[in-house]
């Protein structure tokens, strides 16, 4: 059901349950043909397969980190694809879930650079609330199959989010870890952002 993934069909228009400041900057995306197709594809995936994150958390990155409060963007590829891991924030896992290797590596870098101990929890909600947009380029994934939703159209939407930040904000730190994330460098004006 679209309601469960933050998408509601209203006649032929699509309404997205997303934080107000993001909705203002991205509302033009919701009426584009790709978004209607994306909505239908995601609905079918959630209806016919086990998918992550839970539907109500698909737009969690946007809902926890309003547009005007973004200071840092950490870009991932797609959500974790095992049960109980994905929570709509790139690299984050709920309290009590074992740290995935990618998050362990992030924590090791922080420990190396700042001499901070590695946290036991992988829940990065606090980061999001402090202005870190933990964004995956693809917002959903089928269980046990990495990159399974990469061709559904999410990247059109998340690229638009990056482009909106690039155009309407300044001095945001973009952390593009890995080859896939670095491919998004083309969306960012290095004269305005780090």
Regions found by a protein language model. Name each.
Residues 16, 28-176, 180-189:
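A polyanion-binding, active-site-adjacent surface
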Residues 192-194:
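Short, flexible loop segments at boundaries between secondary-structure elements
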Residues 15-25:
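Generic N-terminal amphipathic, Lys/Arg-enriched alpha-helix
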């Amino acid at each position: 059901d679209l309601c469960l993934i933050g998408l509601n069909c209203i006649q032929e228009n699509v309404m997205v349950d997303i934080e107000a400041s993001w909705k203002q900057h991205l509302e033009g995306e919701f009426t584009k043909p790709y978004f209607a197709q994306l909505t239908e594809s995601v609905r079918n995936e959630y209806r016919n397969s086990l998918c992550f994150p839970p539907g109500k958390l698909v737009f969690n990155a946007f809902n926890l980190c309003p547009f005007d409060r973004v200071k840092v963007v950490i870009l991932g590829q797609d959500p974790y694809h095992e049960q109980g891991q994905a929570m709509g924030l790139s690299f984050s896992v709920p309290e009590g879930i074992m740290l995935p290797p990618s998050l362990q590596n992030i924590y090791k870098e922080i420990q190396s650079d700042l001499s901070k101990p590695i946290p036991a929890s992988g829940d990065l909600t606090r980061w999001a609330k402090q202005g870190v947009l933990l964004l995956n380029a693809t917002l959903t994934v089928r269980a046990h199959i990495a990159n399974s939703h990469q061709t559904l159209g999410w990247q059109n939407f998340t690229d638009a989010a990056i482009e909106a930040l690039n155009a309407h904000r300044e001095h945001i730190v973009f952390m593009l870890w890995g080859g896939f994330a670095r491919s998004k460098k083309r969306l960012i004006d290095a004269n305005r952002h780090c």
